[in-house]
A protein has these predicted regions:
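Well-ordered beta-strand segments characteristic of repetitive beta-sheet solenoids
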Residues: 1-8, 21-28, 41-48, 60-67, ...
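Short, T/G/N/S-enriched strand-turn elements that build extracellular solenoid repeat scaffolds
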Residues: 11-18, 31-38, 50-57, 72-79, ...
Length: 200
């Protein structure tokens, strides 16, 4: 059934929270280190989120909203088998060794560092800064926008069209691997540097 949790602090370290239907969590501070929180429709609103080695799962949808400074997803997994919406425009996400996975992903964040972002269909990522990504993949169209310079160092794959815009400069790094199956549009107000292999 539906489950609603509204509290000043939710500590689920090593614990499990499960809802067969809709789960609403509203808390300024969430500690899900090594824990698991899953629901059919998962709505999470929190200022400070620690999901280190934890699991945040939406079996049909996951909506994550944060107005905090940091989201710790080191070694963690943020997964939706349907739509994954992340709205955290001023939040720095450390996803080193972690996963952000969904059928359709729309993420609007302050910054994201490390880890893998994989969408089975559409992927839209807007960030002031993105760095040290291990892999970014979409089964269909991919759209990435960053304000700062963006060095693409990991593996990038798009099954559809790819639109990549980095206002502060864009670099395809030599250690990066880039494969885009349809049209690719790359733009920057500053510069574009290619040190890798770019193919479409």
């Amino acid at each position: 059934e539906d489950l609603e949790l509204d509290t000043a602090r939710l500590d689920n370290e090593g614990g499990n929270i499960h809802s067969g239907k809709t789960l609403h969590i509203n808390t300024p501070e969430l500690n899900n280190q090594g824990g698991s929180i899953d629901a059919t429709a998962h709505h999470l609103q929190s200022t400070a989120i620690n999901n280190e080695n934890g699991h945040l799962i939406g079996r049909e949808s996951l909506t994550l909203t944060s107005d905090g400074e940091k989201l710790n997803n080191r070694g963690g997994q943020i997964i939706s088998k349907g739509k994954l919406d992340i709205t955290a425009k001023d939040t720095s996400i450390d996803s080193s060794g972690g996963y952000i996975v969904g059928k359709n992903i729309a993420a609007d964040v302050g910054s994201v560092s490390g880890g893998k972002i994989e969408s089975w269909e559409e992927l839209t990522l807007r960030a002031k800064k993105a760095e040290k990504m291990e892999s970014v993949r979409s089964g269909r169209d991919m759209k990435i926008e960053t304000q700062d310079k963006y060095s693409m160092t990991g593996q990038y794959y798009s099954g559809g069209e790819a639109v990549i815009r980095a206002t502060g400069g864009l670099e395809f790094a030599p250690e990066g691997k880039f494969e885009f199956n349809e049209n690719i549009k790359v733009s920057s107000d500053a510069y574009i540097i290619n040190r890798g292999l770019l193919s479409s």
